[in-house]
């Protein structure tokens, strides 16, 4: 059993990108599903689907690569920020701009999981889960 499902998912995505896989399988949890929805909406992954096998389920994620250079993935860096031993919470005005706005910060708020820019526009803070660029 994995204690931190977000770190596990990010590591699986990172390893699949390094191995240039087209799809990767990650455990099915609500937080993983919500993070993947944000990544799909922002254009970092193609899509994902929920599959069930016996008692447990998993998410099958289709990775996205650049159209000009098929070897270069759309996801280059996935960095976990908040971890079980040290949670990182921010107010609205302290939400960081990742790489000057090139990347995204994924934040868990009272309104759900969203990007840092959307949370800033809504005027709500939350827990910084990870940075993506």
Curated annotation (Swiss-Prot):
InterPro entries: Ribosomal_uS8, Ribosomal_uS8_CS, Ribosomal_uS8_sf. GO terms for cellular component: chloroplast; ribonucleoprotein complex; ribosome. It is found in: Plastid, Chloroplast. GO terms for biological process: translation. Disulfide bonds: none annotated. SUPFAM superfamilies: Ribosomal protein S8 (SSF56047). PANTHER family: 40S RIBOSOMAL PROTEIN S15A (PTHR11758). One of the primary rRNA binding proteins, it binds directly to 16S rRNA central domain where it helps coordinate assembly of the platform of the 30S subunit. This is Small ribosomal subunit protein uS8c.
């Amino acid at each position: 059993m994995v204690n931190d499902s977000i770190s596990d998912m990010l590591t699986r995505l990172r390893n699949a990108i390094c191995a240039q896989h087209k799809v990767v399988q990650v455990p099915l949890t609500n937080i993983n599903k919500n993070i993947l929805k944000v990544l799909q909406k922002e254009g970092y992954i193609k899509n994902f689907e929920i599959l069930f096998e016996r008692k447990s389920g998993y998410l099958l994620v289709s990775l996205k690569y650049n159209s000009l250079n098929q070897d270069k993935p759309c996801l280059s860096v996935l960095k976990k920020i908040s971890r079980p031993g040290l949670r990182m919470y921010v107010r609205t005005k302290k939400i960081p701009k990742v790489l000057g706005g090139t990347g995204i910060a994924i934040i868990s708020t009272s309104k759900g999981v969203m990007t840092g820019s959307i949370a800033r526009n809504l005027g709500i803070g939350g827990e910084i889960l990870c940075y993506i660029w």
